[in-house]
Amino acid sequence: MSQLNIHLKLKIVENKAFLTAEKFSMTDKVAYAEGSVVSKIIIRNERGNITLFAFDKDEFLSEHTAPYDAIVQVLDGKAEIIIDGETFELSVGESIIMPANVRHAVVAVEQFKMLLTMIK
């Protein structure tokens, strides 16, 4: 019988480990904190990043721009995503693309979690 060797790449992020061959729930990997926005980087490299966020109700990311397109996927709760002055209300399971170099902001209508993916 041959021996099977399994090698897992380990990503250490904010003192949390993400195994590349491990099943997990996105919503369980980031917790709400009262009066805060919590973020956990899942992957960050020269090609882009994937980050989880948990927003307490009424918390926000102020208006800013990013040099690359980014997609927001709502995992829990509701949020308003403001893109170039237009407001979009998103709920669980909904997504939106924020275009590169266009002003945008994120506001938690209630507690909500999102996955942000930005590819360079």
What are these regions (language model features)?
Residues 100-120:
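Ligand-binding loop in jelly-roll beta-barrel domains
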Residues 1-47, 82:
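A short, N-terminal "cap"/entry segment at the start of jelly-roll beta-barrel domains
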Residues 68-80, 84:
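Glycine- and acidic-residue-biased ligand/ion/polar-headgroup-sensing regions
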Residues 75-76, 91-92, 110:
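A cytosolic small-molecule/anion-sensing beta-strand core signal
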Residues 35-36, 50-66:
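Conserved short histidine dyad/triad with adjacent acidic residue
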Residues 85-100:
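Short acidic-glycine-tyrosine-enriched beta hairpin
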Residues 49, 78-80, 87, 103, ...:
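Structural motif
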